[in-house]
């Protein structure tokens, strides 16, 4: 008696957690850099180099990559002319501070896969003394513990003497797990209104309006690489240049069904900006390189035939059931959250003359369940580079955190629903209303996918059943009154006959029965 089965590749989420990690490090300025007077601008990002899982202990190893623009304490005779700006010297530091952090993710084991997503929620660089900086910040961490496994579903028994109750089950089959690095490179030329580049001072790079589509054997990732460049001109003026270039990259993956379901997460991996000569030999071109770490999955939604129950009228056998988790798609929902906020710089003594550019990031603070979906709360972080009224150093950067909240509709959620949410910036515009008041307009894209992980009983094998000496079962002919919740299949199985035999004896045209119906059953 052979059991015919089908294996279905699944990825089961076991546990997830969201937490924050604080860091506080001292940074000693290298000997080739002058003393610091004041920090003007700072920005950074988190880079994860290695993830090690030992039971429930997760070790993260990486670094905080940061950039600092500062003014030096004094200007000495003999300094290069391009290094003097309005009586102060502007210096740039780009470095990384390594870190290792231990986190606990309860419920995972050695065989599980751990996914980690990080973001830099806050970064503050302060001056301790002329040779030392304090670098403080908060890292947000998303942890997902999951296991890839094969669900073996019984589809039929290759035996004509066995009665089989067939059914259907919707499953989400994992076709491909995607993990790749997407590299982006653009070469842009300064507008004619901008002077030539003497030295790059700072660069802020981020990705916006990211979208992806699945097309049979690949995922197409499109978006816009946004960069704000601060440089020193040949006339010793600080200049800013903002550029936004579109890109499109293909990520190869398994699967040949155009209707497959894709889910993709991206994280910034690196960026680099260099000044290059144009065709005339002038330093008027910028080479902008960036990389995105891509992680995701491709599923196909299938309806498979399953064997729900079986018995034999000729020999005493019974199915062996085992409880397993079956993954299915509940909903994939993408929504937009529009943000409008007016802000006032109360404590600033410098008047803003012009906003040069921005760097943005959207992070999730909390996800709460609602009646028919979830409420996503987060923060839109905007770093603004400004030209200010200051002859000593006419550039500064300030960071604003604008909260947002959006309801995402996911009807049918219950305790077995696993929901993953990704937020990213589509558009941001900062308008200067006066010298101290400005307006932030933005659009944040919120992508949510809800998977249902229900526990079901599936047949895994067939074994011999002990024979019963019950007199009712030994009787050749039985009269039976249908009880509440009775089904024709259960009655036929109990008395070792067939549904067709009961219908024929009782002159029934269907297997539909109701309580108090009277049936004559002939045991086979």
Where are these regions (language model features)?
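Interfacial loop/beta elements and low-complexity acidic/Ser/Thr-rich segments
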Residues: 1-472
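Primarily a LysM-type cell-wall glycan-binding module
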Residues: 467-504, 509-524
């Amino acid at each position: 008696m052979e059991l015919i089965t089908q294996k279905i590749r699944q990825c089961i989420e076991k546990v997830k957690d969201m937490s924050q990690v604080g860091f506080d490090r001292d940074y000693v300025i290298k000997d080739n850099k002058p003393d610091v007077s004041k920090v003007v601008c700072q920005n950074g990002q988190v880079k994860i180099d290695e993830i090690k899982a030992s039971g429930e202990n997760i070790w993260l190893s990486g670094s905080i990559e940061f950039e600092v623009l500062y003014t030096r304490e004094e200007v000495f005779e003999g300094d290069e002319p391009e290094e003097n700006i309005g009586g102060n010297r502007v210096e740039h530091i780009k470095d990384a501070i390594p870190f290792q952090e231990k986190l606990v993710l309860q419920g995972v084991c050695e065989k599980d896969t751990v996914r980690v997503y990080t973001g830099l929620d806050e970064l503050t660089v302060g001056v301790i003394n002329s040779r030392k900086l304090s670098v403080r910040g908060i890292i947000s961490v998303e942890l997902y513990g999951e296991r890839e496994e094969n669900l073996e579903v019984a589809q039929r028994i290759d035996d004509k003497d066995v009665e089989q109750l067939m059914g259907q089950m919707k499953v989400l089959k994992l076709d491909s797990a995607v993990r790749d690095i997407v590299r982006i490179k653009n070469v842009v030329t300064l507008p004619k209104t901008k002077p030539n580049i003497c030295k790059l001072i700072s660069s802020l790079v981020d990705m916006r309006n990211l979208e992806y589509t699945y097309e049979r054997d690949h995922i197409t990732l499109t978006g816009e690489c946004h960069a704000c460049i601060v440089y020193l001109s040949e006339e010793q003026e600080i200049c800013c240049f903002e550029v936004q270039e579109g890109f499109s990259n293909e990520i190869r993956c398994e699967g040949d069904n155009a209707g497959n379901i894709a889910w993709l997460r991206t994280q910034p991996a690196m960026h680099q900006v260099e000044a290059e000569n144009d065709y005339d030999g002038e330093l008027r071109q910028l080479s902008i390189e960036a990389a995105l770490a891509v992680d995701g999955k491709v599923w196909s939604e299938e309806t498979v035939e399953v064997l729900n129950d079986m018995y034999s009228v000729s020999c005493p056998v019974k199915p062996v059931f085992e409880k397993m988790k079956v993954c299915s798609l509940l909903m994939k929902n993408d929504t937009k959250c529009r943000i409008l906020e007016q802000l006032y710089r109360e404590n600033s003594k410098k008047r803003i003359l012009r906003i040069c550019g921005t760097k943005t990031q959207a992070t999730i603070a909390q996800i709460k369940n609602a009646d028919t979906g979830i409420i996503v709360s987060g923060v839109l972080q905007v770093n603004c580079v400004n030209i200010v009224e200051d002859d000593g150093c006419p550039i500064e950067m300030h960071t604003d955190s604008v909260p947002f909240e959006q309801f995402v509709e996911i009807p049918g959620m219950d305790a077995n629903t696993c929901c993953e949410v990704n937020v990213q910036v589509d558009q941001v515009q900062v308008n200067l209303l006066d010298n101290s008041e400005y307006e932030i307009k933005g659009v944040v894209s919120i992508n949510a996918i809800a998977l249902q992980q229900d526990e079901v009983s599936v047949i895994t094998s067939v074994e011999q059943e002990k024979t019963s000496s019950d007199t009712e079962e030994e009787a050749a002919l039985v009269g039976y009154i249908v009880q509440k919740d009775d089904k024709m299949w259960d009655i036929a199985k109990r008395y070792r006959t067939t549904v067709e035999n009961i219908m024929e004896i009782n002159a029934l045209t269907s297997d539909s029965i109701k309580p108090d119906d009277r049936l004559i059953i002939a045991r086979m």
